[in-house]
């Protein structure tokens, strides 16, 4: 669902008109966030040593309200070998044009 996109997508808005879908989606989202996304605070940064020997590319939407850019910056600082791309016209969704384009660019480097 496109609840975390910078630019609203009408197909997702129309999908939310279905009350059964909207209720199910809302329950899942609430369960996820009420449970602290099922990770303790700082979990990823505490486990960062496991990422030291693999390539890490961080793609962050500038207007992501789910995972703030400060989180991406902290991860990037903890992983000196990582790359960080801030997509200026994106929110949280990997389906946003700028994020999708950057993910494809990164993936193509590994062909």
Residue positions per predicted region:
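Catalytic active-site module of serine/aspartate enzymes centered on a nucleophile-bearing elbow/loop
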Residues: 82-111
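Conserved alpha/beta-hydrolase "acid-adjacent" motif
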Residues: 40, 65-71
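Alpha/beta-hydrolase
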Residues: 1-47, 54
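Short beta-strand/loop motif that positions the catalytic acidic residue
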Residues: 51-52, 58-60, 64
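Short amphipathic alpha-helical segments and helix-helix/interface helices
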Residues: 45-48, 72, 104
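Active-site-adjacent alpha-helix of alpha/beta-hydrolase-fold enzymes
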Residues: 69-83
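Short, conserved loop/helix-junction motifs that constitute active-site signature segments
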Residues: 49-53, 78-79
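Hydrophobic, well-ordered secondary-structure elements that form the walls
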Residues: 29, 64, 75
């Amino acid at each position: 669902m496109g609840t975390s996109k910078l630019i609203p997508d009408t197909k997702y808005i129309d999908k939310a008109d279905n009350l059964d879908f909207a209720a199910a989606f809302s329950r899942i989202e609430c369960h996820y966030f009420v449970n602290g996304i099922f990770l303790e605070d700082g979990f990823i940064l505490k486990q960062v040593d496991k990422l030291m020997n693999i390539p890490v590319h961080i793609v962050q939407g500038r207007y992501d309200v789910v995972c703030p850019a400060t989180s991406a910056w902290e991860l990037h600082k903890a992983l000196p070998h990582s790359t960080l791309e801030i997509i200026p016209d994106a929110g949280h969704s990997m389906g946003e044009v700028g994020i999708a384009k950057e993910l494809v660019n990164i993936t193509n480097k590994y062909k």
